[in-house]
Amino acid sequence: MPIITLPDGSQRQFDNPVSTMEVAQSIGPGLAKATIAGRVNGNRVDACDLIEEDASLEIITVKDEVDGLEIVRHSCAHLLGHALKQLYPQAKMAIGPTIDNGFYYDIDLDESLTQEDLEKIEKRMKELAKTKYEVVKKKVSWQEARDTFESRGEPYKVEILDENVSRDDRPGLYHHEEYIDMCRGPHVPNMGFCQHFTLLNVAGAYWRGNSDNKMLQRIYGTAFHDKKALKAHLTRLEEAAKRDHRKIGKQLDLFHMQQEAPGMVFWHHNGWSIFRDLEVFVRDKLNEYDYQEVKGPLMMDRVLWERSGHWDKYADAMFTTSSENREYAIKPMNCPGHVQIFNQGLKSYRDLPLRMAEFGSCHRNEPSGALHGIMRVRGFTQDDAHIFCTESQIQEEVTSCIKMVYDTYQTFGFDNIVVKLSTRPEKRVGSDEIWDQSEEALKQSLESMEIPYEIQEGEGAFYGPKIEFTLYDCLDRAWQCGTVQLDFNLPGRLGATYVGENNERLVPVMIHRAILGSLERFIGILIEEYAGFFPTWLAPEQAVLMNITDKQSGYVQEIVQKLQKSGIRAKADLRNEKIGFKIREHTLKRVPYMLVVGDQEMEAGEIAVRTRKGKDLGKFKVDDFIAYIQDEISSRKLNLEE
């Protein structure tokens, strides 16, 4: 006789084990019709799963924008599998999980799927969903599940059972009419909930993400509760495609990638200009917040990486080389090198906090399938910093780091920032006392600045709690960039100590701090955020001067030289082309200011100024324009509207 407690505190008693759907039906037919699944004592369950003991229950409906939508998307992945097996009976099904904003299914199929094939598959999915057939869940023994998929010729499902499912477990088999899939669930009770979806694209993916395994075909899709939300998402995807940093990078001559150096960036002059301006900006912040800038070696002996613990955890992601019977690893991160710098010379508590920053050139052997333009690379520059401090200094230093993060992001126009605090995991180093003190210090730092945050219980690293900063761009995409991570482990492993007030040797706390993360990735984010319309201070070309006839050529060149001497990235366009043609061309290149000179301007010692978005700013004396643009550059104004 389970007693079910609902979110409003009311209780309902049942004579027999009861399902979420039956509870919903007891409340009303409208709720039952909208019910997708349940959350029993905080755990998601299928609407048909029986509740045998007293429990709290939340009914998940179509209006649930988090769990409800994820369940719909997961069920759409099964629907995709259903359609695929009808159209391609020879296909071998691998996995079909949800991802941010959608789902995918990995399949083993000899023929390569095209966009036309995706349209055919989507059409079949819609035909199936239109029937609103019921999804039937059956819990079976491990052996029965294995026999089921072996008889159906599904080797990937069999492998999952053999390697990932306990023999004592009872896997859930979901019957979609003649199609059967295996999943933890939950899933929708019927396909009437899966009406608003589309397939997006197909790509290659190694089975289990291992390049030693077979390359499968991964079909991506997305789904929403209603047609309006789906349409809005597809519009965002279209806008994202227009803003693709790879496309704009080529258009603006910023960088390129090539097969001979996978995951390594070839920076062109225009792109390197942006990179250097970012470095200058970060250096200004480092000076403002009292950091020392250092530079560590690109590679170090394997012995050091073994002592730091990185060899055990990151060896597969590290590039190595050897010389004179010694093995070296190219650094994937800067922290062990910074500890070596700290260790040079005796340190006192009076020397702390010591803030050490580096534009570290790091390399990680990312899988080739994961590489993506300059967003996911193998060679990158990290705006890394490490703060060595005492336990009593943690809160003050963390607060300073948080201020620096917000100062930086606001300069680029990122105001929507989600903050997450990850607390101690079960397996960890350090005393409970230091964890208590550190977690409280992180909380106090955030609360003192009135910053809302989410707590991720048990998600901290084994060596310390951390704060993560995720910024959202103009398309509402999340980018996790900033991190403030406490470390009670590495300094001790690498022998870092300082002399305390009582002349005892103590191990400092280390704070790992990144703001932009990888400069390459952050530039990619900026390209897509601004669609190539960089603020003037970042723009590779800040002004272009154009003559109307050859008569003004000399005057234009004089002005260009004057602008350049004033620190403005300016150039002349003296081509024998119509002025409208030249303006259009430089507009496409996103040059912030186009300066036009005709006879009238030359005689008056002026220039006609217009922005790349077509706004006419009128005529300026040359010195007045220099003062105008210098103010915009030095103050790092966004000026995105112009």
UniProtKB/Swiss-Prot annotation:
<dbReference type="InterPro" id="IPR033728">
    <property type="entry name" value="ThrRS_core"/>
</dbReference>
<feature type="binding site">
    <location>
        <position position="512"/>
    </location>
    <ligand>
        <name>Zn(2+)</name>
    </ligand>
</feature>
<keyword id="KW-0963">Cytoplasm</keyword>
<dbReference type="InterPro" id="IPR002320">
    <property type="entry name" value="Thr-tRNA-ligase_IIa"/>
</dbReference>
<dbReference type="InterPro" id="IPR004154">
    <property type="entry name" value="Anticodon-bd"/>
</dbReference>
<keyword id="KW-0547">Nucleotide-binding</keyword>
<comment type="function">
    <text>Catalyzes the attachment of threonine to tRNA(Thr) in a two-step reaction: L-threonine is first activated by ATP to form Thr-AMP and then transferred to the acceptor end of tRNA(Thr). Also edits incorrectly charged L-seryl-tRNA(Thr).</text>
</comment>
<feature type="domain" description="TGS">
    <location>
        <begin position="1"/>
        <end position="61"/>
    </location>
</feature>
<keyword id="KW-0648">Protein biosynthesis</keyword>
<feature type="binding site">
    <location>
        <position position="335"/>
    </location>
    <ligand>
        <name>Zn(2+)</name>
    </ligand>
</feature>
<dbReference type="InterPro" id="IPR036621">
    <property type="entry name" value="Anticodon-bd_dom_sf"/>
</dbReference>
<comment type="similarity">
    <text>Belongs to the class-II aminoacyl-tRNA synthetase family.</text>
</comment>
<dbReference type="InterPro" id="IPR012947">
    <property type="entry name" value="tRNA_SAD"/>
</dbReference>
<dbReference type="InterPro" id="IPR012675">
    <property type="entry name" value="Beta-grasp_dom_sf"/>
</dbReference>
<dbReference type="InterPro" id="IPR004095">
    <property type="entry name" value="TGS"/>
</dbReference>
<keyword id="KW-0820">tRNA-binding</keyword>
<dbReference type="GO" id="GO:0004829">
    <property type="term" value="F:threonine-tRNA ligase activity"/>
</dbReference>
<keyword id="KW-0862">Zinc</keyword>
<feature type="binding site">
    <location>
        <position position="386"/>
    </location>
    <ligand>
        <name>Zn(2+)</name>
    </ligand>
</feature>
<protein>
    <recommendedName>
        <fullName>Threonine--tRNA ligase</fullName>
        <ecNumber>6.1.1.3</ecNumber>
    </recommendedName>
</protein>
<comment type="subunit">
    <text>Homodimer.</text>
</comment>
<dbReference type="InterPro" id="IPR002314">
    <property type="entry name" value="aa-tRNA-synt_IIb"/>
</dbReference>
<keyword id="KW-0067">ATP-binding</keyword>
<dbReference type="Pfam" id="PF02824">
    <property type="entry name" value="TGS"/>
</dbReference>
<dbReference type="GO" id="GO:0005524">
    <property type="term" value="F:ATP binding"/>
</dbReference>
<dbReference type="InterPro" id="IPR045864">
    <property type="entry name" value="aa-tRNA-synth_II/BPL/LPL"/>
</dbReference>
<keyword id="KW-0694">RNA-binding</keyword>
<dbReference type="GO" id="GO:0006435">
    <property type="term" value="P:threonyl-tRNA aminoacylation"/>
</dbReference>
<dbReference type="Pfam" id="PF00587">
    <property type="entry name" value="tRNA-synt_2b"/>
</dbReference>
<dbReference type="Pfam" id="PF07973">
    <property type="entry name" value="tRNA_SAD"/>
</dbReference>
<dbReference type="GO" id="GO:0005829">
    <property type="term" value="C:cytosol"/>
</dbReference>
<keyword id="KW-0479">Metal-binding</keyword>
<dbReference type="InterPro" id="IPR047246">
    <property type="entry name" value="ThrRS_anticodon"/>
</dbReference>
<feature type="region of interest" description="Catalytic">
    <location>
        <begin position="244"/>
        <end position="535"/>
    </location>
</feature>
<dbReference type="GO" id="GO:0046872">
    <property type="term" value="F:metal ion binding"/>
</dbReference>
<keyword id="KW-0436">Ligase</keyword>
<dbReference type="InterPro" id="IPR006195">
    <property type="entry name" value="aa-tRNA-synth_II"/>
</dbReference>
<dbReference type="GO" id="GO:0000049">
    <property type="term" value="F:tRNA binding"/>
</dbReference>
<dbReference type="Pfam" id="PF03129">
    <property type="entry name" value="HGTP_anticodon"/>
</dbReference>
<keyword id="KW-0030">Aminoacyl-tRNA synthetase</keyword>
<dbReference type="InterPro" id="IPR018163">
    <property type="entry name" value="Thr/Ala-tRNA-synth_IIc_edit"/>
</dbReference>
<dbReference type="InterPro" id="IPR012676">
    <property type="entry name" value="TGS-like"/>
</dbReference>
